[in-house]
């Protein structure tokens, strides 16, 4: 290991969707490599200290449900682990312990001490004073853009992990293990930067969305002339054209339900005239179907009483229209269809129809003044 500066920057990257739940891993790069200004003669001791720092990270993953998972390999070991199998989306891509294990094996160092000290390393990480800070920083990263139910599960998992750490015994003190202190401090700072970089574009997107919504609403309310004509009666009836509809451009958050109600009111005021005309057209089309049951029954009663000569006069048609609520055209069509389907004049009536001057049949009183339709004439009459 070469000596260098302690302030080494590290790029940040995430993968996965926070909406999948609190257990979904967070992809991260390697933490800042901890270096020392010690003499080159102590390289082996410094390498062992760095190895312990990475071992703290690996066993911290096993101690809590909030894993710092899916860690990408450092740049120097990328080729060494290229042949490893690809993990699933919710499993670590590379374990720091495995990466460092490969480095140690490649350098001829015995890795047995790292595996035998796993329990003590885990206990040291969970007992470190910065453990709660590390959990909180990780949860804050996962909270960015997450739905409320996921945020609640994250907070619950963080509380459970903190309680598990507290149950293991008293916490340690800073300075007992400088390597662990440096490791925890570096990761906490990294996660805080992650959270800041994630929050910035999310907040900018929310502000942009709210600005566009306000512009759309201002455009819809800035042209009252478009509401004139067919929309004026609706405005007077609803009495909603007040200053309460003005848009506050400084509001950061807008109630979605309030926007829906406002949009519904605007559409009703603007298109109420069209809606009324459409309703009338639908009613007309509905009237073209079957006649109402009560009106049809009245027409059948009249038909049964005048079955011998079912030709109502104009006065009778007007009376039927008034009693049934139908118009005269509907009554005429009903009688025409009824006669075609259910009435055939008798032989005597056929003679009367052909001899319009017959003086003895009282049914012909109105025939000369108002000739009846020819729909009832059968083939025998021709």
From Swiss-Prot:
Tissues with expression: Expressed in all four types of shoot apical meristems (SAM) i.e. in vegetative, axillary, inflorescence and floral.
GO CC terms in record: cytoplasm; endosome; microtubule cytoskeleton; nucleus; plasma membrane; plasmodesma
Lineage top rank: taxon: Eukaryota
Region of interest: Disordered: 26-59
GO biological process: carpel development; cytokinin biosynthetic process; floral meristem determinacy; plasmodesmata-mediated intercellular transport; regulation of meristem structural organization; stem cell population maintenance
Domain ELK, residue spans: 262-282
Listed Basic and acidic residues bias regions: 44-53
Record-given protein name: Homeobox protein SHOOT MERISTEMLESS
CDD domains according to UniProt: homeodomain
Keywords: Cell junction, Cell membrane, Cytoplasm, Developmental protein, DNA-binding, Endosome, Homeobox, Membrane, Nucleus, RNA-binding
Coiled coil region boundaries: none
Listed Pfam families: ELK, Homeobox_KN, KNOX1, KNOX2
Subunit-structure text: Forms homodimers. May form heterodimeric complexes with TALE/BELL proteins BEL1, BLH2, BLH3, BLH8/PNF, BLH9/PNY and ATH1. Interacts with CCT8. Binds to MBP2C; this interaction reduces RNA binding capacity. Interacts with FTIP3 and FTIP4.
Species name: Arabidopsis thaliana
SMART domains: ELK (SM01188), HOX (SM00389), KNOX1 (SM01255), KNOX2 (SM01256)
Any one GO molecular-function label of the UniProt entry: DNA-binding transcription factor activity
């Amino acid at each position: 290991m070469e000596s260098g500066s302690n302030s080494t920057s590290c790029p940040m990257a995430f993968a996965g969707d926070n909406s999948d739940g609190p257990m979904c891993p967070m992809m991260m790069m390697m933490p800042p490599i901890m270096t020392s200004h010690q003499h080159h003669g102590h390289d082996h001791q410094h390498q062992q200290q760095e190895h312990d720092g990475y071992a703290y990270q690996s066993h911290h993953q096993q101690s809590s449900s909030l894993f710092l998972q899916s860690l990408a390999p450092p740049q120097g070991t990328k080729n060494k682990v290229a042949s490893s199998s690809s993990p699933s989306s919710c499993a670590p891509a590379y374990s720091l312990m495995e990466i460092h294990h490969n480095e140690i094996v490649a350098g001829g160092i015995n890795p047995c001490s790292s595996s035998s000290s796993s329990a003590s390393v885990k206990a040291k990480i969970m007992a470190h004073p910065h453990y709660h800070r590390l959990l909180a920083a990780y949860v804050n990263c996962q909270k960015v853009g997450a739905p409320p139910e996921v945020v609640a599960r994250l907070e619950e998992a963080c509380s459970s992990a903190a309680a598990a750490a507290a149950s293991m015994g008293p916490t340690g003190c800073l300075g007992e293990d400088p390597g662990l202190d440096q490791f925890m401090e570096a990761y906490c700072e990294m996660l805080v930067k992650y959270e800041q970089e994630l929050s910035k574009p999310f907040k900018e997107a929310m502000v942009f969305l709210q600005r566009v919504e306000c512009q759309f609403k201002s455009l819809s309310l800035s042209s009252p002339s478009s509401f004139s004509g067919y929309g004026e009666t609706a405005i007077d009836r609803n009495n909603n054209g007040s200053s309460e509809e003005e848009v506050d451009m400084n509001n950061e958050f807008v109630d979605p339900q309030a926007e829906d109600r406002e949009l519904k009111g605007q559409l009703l005021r603007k298109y109420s005239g069209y809606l009324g005309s459409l309703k009338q057209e639908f009613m007309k089309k509905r009237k073209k179907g079957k006649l109402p049951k009560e009106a049809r029954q009245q027409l059948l009663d009249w038909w049964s009483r005048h079955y011998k000569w079912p030709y109502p006069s104009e006065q009778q048609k007007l009376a039927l229209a008034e009693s049934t609520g139908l118009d005269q055209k509907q009554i005429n069509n009903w009688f025409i269809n009824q006669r075609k389907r259910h009435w055939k004049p008798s032989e005597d009536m056929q003679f009367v129809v052909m001899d319009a001057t017959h003086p003895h049949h009282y049914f012909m009183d109105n025939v000369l003044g108002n000739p009846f339709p020819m729909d009832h004439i059968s083939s025998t009459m021709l």
